[in-house]
């Protein structure tokens, strides 16, 4: 199934039913009082997190959703039927954003979580409601209120404990195959991975964590080059990042240069994401001589001025992967214990998570704006000079209004 992690939809709640104007008419009762019933409330629309879904592809083809309208009221004080609520199922990890205001309406991070995105219109009142001591036969009713309507943007971020970073062909997919049962495609050419892959890594019998592999980054990714930059948002919810570096590139380029590219692109995309706990994992150690290994490790560590943990592994032969997996599990457990015991630490991480979300969304929005400008024939906003501004347009309120709609 095609992996889709961003869609735009329009949702419209049901209108409320109108109130009824009716009077009681029975045998021997010629002038009975009012008996018009109220209308029914319109149906609302809810987003529901479904653990069985992993893509938003269903919303790529069907984009408009309407809830049922409430029925009109009836005679003999009959209330109209309420419109049926509509549930839209989305994968766990979906963020719902108002496309008009860019306000985050909600974040569905748990299976079964339910969020109302538009509310149905209120019912109209029947003429019975307006009966009084001075008005015995009211002919007044009210119509149902219209239901809310919204344009929404749905963003899916995979939920994983560990995220993998690296250039194409750094061995990320091979690594995830070696430590989990996931079987992502592996080949000897760049960009083999086109969508995020998840794998569950079992440590001992009852312990496990989820690891996410995203398409590789390249130099200039923060400016829109390559595939990986749009998928970096999937690492926003991870607890730890593994920076994989190919120690023996086929083109004999410098591994230190490759490592530096990833660090720079990560900083440009989100400085806060770069603050996340990050471990350096030097892969493909089996392809270089043992006497050269230490020298190459030192070169990479010195170039990056690295002070964090460093692991030298070979994903294909599983050399060093078990130790790395156990250390990750230990770190995740210690982190969870500290979160429960230290409220200040929990607040600090929550604030970091929010900054990462905000920076990632702003960066992707800027890339979308840039793409829209290119489609309109403008390379960038800086290409619009002062000569393109007509001061006469300021007072011309009757002129045409041009609205540019971003795809």
Swiss-Prot record:
GO MF, one annotated term: magnesium ion binding
Chief place where the protein resides: cytoplasm
One Pfam family from the record: MMR_HSR1
CDD domains: Obg (cd01898)
Residue ranges with Polar residues bias: 129-143
Signal peptide as annotated in the record: none
Subcellular location: Cytoplasm
Record-listed E.C. numbers: 3.6.5.-
Region (Disordered): 128-148, 375-407
All copies of domain OBG-type G, residue ranges: 160-333
Family: Belongs to the TRAFAC class OBG-HflX-like GTPase superfamily. OBG GTPase family.
Function according to Swiss-Prot or TrEMBL: An essential GTPase which binds GTP, GDP and possibly (p)ppGpp with moderate affinity, with high nucleotide exchange rates and a fairly low GTP hydrolysis rate. Plays a role in control of the cell cycle, stress response, ribosome biogenesis and in those bacteria that undergo differentiation, in morphogenesis control.
PANTHER family: DEVELOPMENTALLY REGULATED GTP-BINDING PROTEIN-RELATED, MITOCHONDRIAL RIBOSOME-ASSOCIATED GTPASE 2
Identification of the protein by name: GTPase Obg
Native species: Pseudomonas fluorescens (strain ATCC BAA-477 / NRRL B-23932 / Pf-5)
Taxonomic classification: Bacteria, Pseudomonadati, Pseudomonadota, Gammaproteobacteria, Pseudomonadales
């Amino acid at each position: 199934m095609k992996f889709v992690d961003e869609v735009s939809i329009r949702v419209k709640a049901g209108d409320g039913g109108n109130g009824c104007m009716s009077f009681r008419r029975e045998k021997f009762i010629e002038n009975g009082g009012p008996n018009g019933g109220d209308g029914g409330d319109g149906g609302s629309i809810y987003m529901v997190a479904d653990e069985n879904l992993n893509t938003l592809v269903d919303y790529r083809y069907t984009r408009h959703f309407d809830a049922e309208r409430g029925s009109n009221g009836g005679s003999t004080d009959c209330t109209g039927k309420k419109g049926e609520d509509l549930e839209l199922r989305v994968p766990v990890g979906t963020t719902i954003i108002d496309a008009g205001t860019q306000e985050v309406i909600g974040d569905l991070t748990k299976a079964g979580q339910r969020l109302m995105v538009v509310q149905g219109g209120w019912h109209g009142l029947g003429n019975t409601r307006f009966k009084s001591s001075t008005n015995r036969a009211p002919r007044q009713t009210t119509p149902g209120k219209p239901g809310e309507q919204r344009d929404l943007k749905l963003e899916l971020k995979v939920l994983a404990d560990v995220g993998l970073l690296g250039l194409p062909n750094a061995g990320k997919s091979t690594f995830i195959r070696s430590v989990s049962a996931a079987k992502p495609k592996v080949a000897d050419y760049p960009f083999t991975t086109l969508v995020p892959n998840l794998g569950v890594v079992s440590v001992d019998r009852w312990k496990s964590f989820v690891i996410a592999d995203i398409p590789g980054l390249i130099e200039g990714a923060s400016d829109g080059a390559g595939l990986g930059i749009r998928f970096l948002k999937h690492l926003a919810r991870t607890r730890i990042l593994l920076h994989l570096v190919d120690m023996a590139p086929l083109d004999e380029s410098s591994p230190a240069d490759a490592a530096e590219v990833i660090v720079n692109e990560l900083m440009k995309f989100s400085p806060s994401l770069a603050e996340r706990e990050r471990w350096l994992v030097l892969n493909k150690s089996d392809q270089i001589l043992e006497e050269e290994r230490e020298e190459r490790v030192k070169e990479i560590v010195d170039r990056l001025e690295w002070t964090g943990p460093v692991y030298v592994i070979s994903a294909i032969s599983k050399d060093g992967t078990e130790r790395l997996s156990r250390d990750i599990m230990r770190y995740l457990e210690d982190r969870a214990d500290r979160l429960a015991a230290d409220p200040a630490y929990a607040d600090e991480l929550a604030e970091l998570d929010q900054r990462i979300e905000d920076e990632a969304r702003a960066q992707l929005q800027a890339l979308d704006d840039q793409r829209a400008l290119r489609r309109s024939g403008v390379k960038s906003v800086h290409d619009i000079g002062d000569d393109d501004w007509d001061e006469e347009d300021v007072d011309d309120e009757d002129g045409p209004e041009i609205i540019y709609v971003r795809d």
